[in-house]
Amino acid sequence: MFSALCAAAMVTSVSAQGGKDMLSNGIKYLDVPYVAHTLEADGPEELVINCDEVDCTTLVEYVLAETLTPKLADGDISESAFADNLQKIRYRDGKIDGYTSRLHYIADWINNGVRNGFLQDVTGAMSPDTERLSISYMSSHPQLYKQLANSPENVAKMKKIEQSLSGKEIHYLPKAKLPADGLPWIKDGDIIAITTNTPGLDVAHMGIAFYADSKLLLVHASSTDKKVVVSKVPLS
C-alpha cells in the first residue's frame, strides 16, 4: 500500500514528550472504525467531535488535541479544553467562520499549526528537497463536496484559499531518501503526511510515526482495513 502511495512525505512534530504522548494516545484508537465525511454535517459549520468514527485526518486531529490538553489531577482531561484545542487545530487560527475556515488542505493545516506554535515543521528543518504547491482540487471538483456542490459562494472562497496556497514552497522527503528503518530525525509520534501526484491536491494520507522491529511504520485510519491499524509494511 505505502510503496505505491508514498511518493514523498512531510513530517511535523509536537515536542519530545509530546511525540511520546502522540504515539500512546494514537495507539488507543486501534480498531476504531474508519468512516469518511464525519465532519460534513447539515446546517452552519460547527465543531464536530466524533472519536468513535475517524478518517486519516480526524484521527490525527483527535490524537493531537488530546496530546495538547493537560491532564487533570485524576489523569483525565477537560472536555472543554480538548474541544478548544481541537478547534485550534482544525480551523484557521482557531476561528470557525463557515465551511472554508476549516483547514481542508494539509499544507494549510500544517502551516496553521506551525504559525500558532503547536507544531514544528521537521522536514522544513531537515530536508533540502522542495517543491511549489499548485492547489485547485476542491474548487475544480465541487460536486465531490456537499458544502461546495450547491454553493458558488463557498467555491469562490475556496478558490481564493487555493490561490493563496499555490506557489508557496514546501519541504518534503522523497520516498527514495526514506529507508525502511526510518531516519534519526523522524521520531515516534511525529505526524507524517504522504503527498500525492493528483493534480491540484497536496496530500493523500496521514498518520502517526511508530517504530517497531527497527522499521518505520504508521498508525493510521485505513480506508482499506476500515479501521485504525498499524501499517504492516514500512513507509519506504
Feature annotation, model-predicted:
Residues 19-30, 39, 77:
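Sequence/structural signature of beta-propeller domains
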Residues 34-168, 187, 193, 211, ...:
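Acidic/His-rich structured neighborhood in mature extracellular/periplasmic domains
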